[in-house]
Amino acid sequence: MIAWYGSVEQRRTLGADLAAGKVLGVWNTEPAPGVTVAEEGLRGAKSYATGAGHIDIAVVTAATSEGKQMVLAHAADPARADPSAWRVRGMRATVSGTYDLTGLPVNAATRLGAPGDYEREPRFSAGAWRFAAVQLGGVEHVLTLLRDHLADSPAGQAPVHRARFGKALAAARSAYLWVREAADRAEAANAGPETISFVLLTRGVVEDAGLTVMEAAARSIGTRAFFVDNPLDQACRDLAIYLRQPVPDQALDRAAAAFLAEDAWTDDPLW
């Protein structure tokens, strides 16, 4: 977003920050009444703020009369962070929580883009390929753990386990191909509205792959997969939570409606 909407100085600063090893994030979710831009700066807090008090800079959204305004906010103050509500089965290491933004400055240096840029299409919806790629990494990690178990145990010689692993492998590889094409389409200079439909459908493909692979691991490994000292247990708990992205059913419905209204592969001679 800084590369898309940032000023020359903001992009230069981003390069220096990344070179220095700083960590950046994006925080949009918020408890009522939400974050606003006031005369004295930001007012309000963000929830589900990944790395609250630990990362360096967060791109946050704040309401204005003209729409959501992105602001670059200092995110490393532990006194502003409250992780106490992050009582979840997985992804505990993300140290997510609420982060009080009240009083942080909104000026030319911190204001990112114009109001409305955060939700500007097709970048907003098509940008979902990024979290799908992260999900895919979790899917492939679980698949690797399952593969290692089967390769090192007699279970790997059983046709039923090999068949189950084969289906899981096919699901994960299919998800990879969808994510790769979604990224290519979304990042193309001429990306249009049709890209959104493809990315929305990709979300469901990756979610299905994740559920398939986790179920395959649980069935093939059995009770041992659920012991807390088994790496698969944490991998599945983390993935199960990260698969829960917003409105998955609506995303599938939007994609299906778009594909029914117009051939989504008109540019593909093999379709």
Region locations from a protein language model:
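Glycine-rich flavin
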Residues: 1-55, 260
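Residue-level recognition of alpha-helical structural elements
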Residues: 10-11, 154-157, 161-164, 191-198, ...
